């Protein structure tokens, strides 16, 4: 099914060499809905003072909502700084990969929750999407859905955008999880 060129969808850029700030500035200036959140990290230099540094949560990925034509134009505008993900969620390998609204919403709940112990993965790993699916019903991750996986002897919630990336959480009490039938 071919989508009309003027219909807005979610897309993703892979960002090269930490060039996210000018791209985020472009999105803000042009009022383009996007997800490229930062967190504050504290650096202790010589144990004298603390330096606060803003670090992107997902340094090599920015999600944005626009039309297919605008997404391709932005890729040309930021040549050698970004790459538009293509063919991950569609049959045509040259077509930009559209991301469902639901996947973006669930991924954003986890990515921007501010909880400790989040690990981000630049690649989607289908081996972690086997088994039972769960929904978080309490706590700061309420509303997130994913698979409970075992990584380095710990059980974590694996939330992904199919074909693009994933995030795992730290420990979530079983009482906060509801199995999705």
Where are these regions (language model features)?
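Residue-level signal for beta-strand positions within conserved beta-sheet cores that form or flank
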Residues: 144, 155, 168
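Short coil-to-beta-strand transition motifs
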Residues: 128, 137-144
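Structural motif
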Residues: 58, 151-153
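Short beta-strand-centered aromatic/proline hotspots
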Residues: 143-151
């Amino acid at each position: 099914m071919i989508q009309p060129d003027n219909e807005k969808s979610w897309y993703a850029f892979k960002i090269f060499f930490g060039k996210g700030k000018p791209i985020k500035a472009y999105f803000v200036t042009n009022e383009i809905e996007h997800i490229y959140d930062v967190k504050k990290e504290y650096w202790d230099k010589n144990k004298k003072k603390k330096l606060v540094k803003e670090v992107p949560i997902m340094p090599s990925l920015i999600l944005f909502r626009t039309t297919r034509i605008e997404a391709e134009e932005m890729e040309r505008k930021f040549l050698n700084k970004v790459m538009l993900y293509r063919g991950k969620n569609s049959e045509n390998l040259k077509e930009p990969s559209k991301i469902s609204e639901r996947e973006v919403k669930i991924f954003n709940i986890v990515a921007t929750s501010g909880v400790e112990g989040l690990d981000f993965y630049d690649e989607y790993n289908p081996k972690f999407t086997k088994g039972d699916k769960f929904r978080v019903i309490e706590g700061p991750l309420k509303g997130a859905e994913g698979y409970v996986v075992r990584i380095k002897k710990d059980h974590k919630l694996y939330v992904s955008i199919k074909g693009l990336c994933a995030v795992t959480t730290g420990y979530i009490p079983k009482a906060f999880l509801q199995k999705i039938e």
